């Protein structure tokens, strides 16, 4: 009976320790759940477009942060582009990622941005060479190169201050 209590105590301690430390080694973020939970993704479609295996990721934002001009993205959207691109290419065999983001503010659904990048260009940016643990800081470092290697369209009719 004492062994059973001791074993139960050790197991309880291990479970509580894992929950407190949030250990990503034991419980890594799962694709595609991480996109749905953390990046406002509502749908992912895998299609072949003109012979190219493509993942189309649909995202809906209820808030847009401050932007420097109508032709720029807010900081969170830049992070989202980096993270979504990273997770899709790291977890699938698609050749291209397209992100279509809508803004659900002002009483309707309006396009905010569309981003498209090929796997080779994402690899050239350097973002796909980092670990998942390094992703938040690496996104800030690599995002400008990633965006410059892809195709980005921004709806310049949305308000600059959200």
Curated annotation (Swiss-Prot):
Major subcellular site: membrane
Location relative to the cell: Membrane
Chain segments annotated as transmembrane: 7-27
Any one of the GO CC terms: membrane
Keywords per UniProt: Membrane, Transmembrane, Transmembrane helix
Membrane topology, record value: Single-pass membrane protein
Protein's name according to its UniProt entry: Uncharacterized protein MJ0415
Classification lineage: Archaea, Methanobacteriati, Methanobacteriota, Methanomada group, Methanococci
């Amino acid at each position: 009976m004492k062994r059973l209590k001791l074993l139960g105590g050790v197991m309880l301690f291990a479970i509580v320790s894992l929950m407190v430390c949030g250990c990503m080694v034991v419980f890594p973020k799962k694709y595609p759940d991480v996109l749905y939970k953390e990046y406002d993704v509502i749908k992912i479609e895998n299609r072949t477009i003109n012979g190219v295996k493509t993942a189309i990721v649909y995202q809906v934002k209820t808030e847009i942060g401050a932007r420097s001009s109508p032709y720029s993205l807010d900081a969170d959207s830049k992070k989202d582009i980096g993270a979504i691109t990273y997770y899709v290419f790291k977890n699938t065999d698609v050749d291209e990622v397209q992100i279509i983001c809508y803004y659900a503010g002002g009483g309707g659904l309006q396009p905010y941005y569309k981003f498209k990048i090929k796997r080779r260009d994402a690899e050239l940016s350097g973002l796909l060479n980092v670990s998942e643990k390094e992703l938040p800081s690496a996104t800030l470092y690599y995002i400008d190169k990633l965006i410059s290697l892809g195709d980005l369209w921004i709806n310049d009719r949305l308000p600059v201050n959200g």
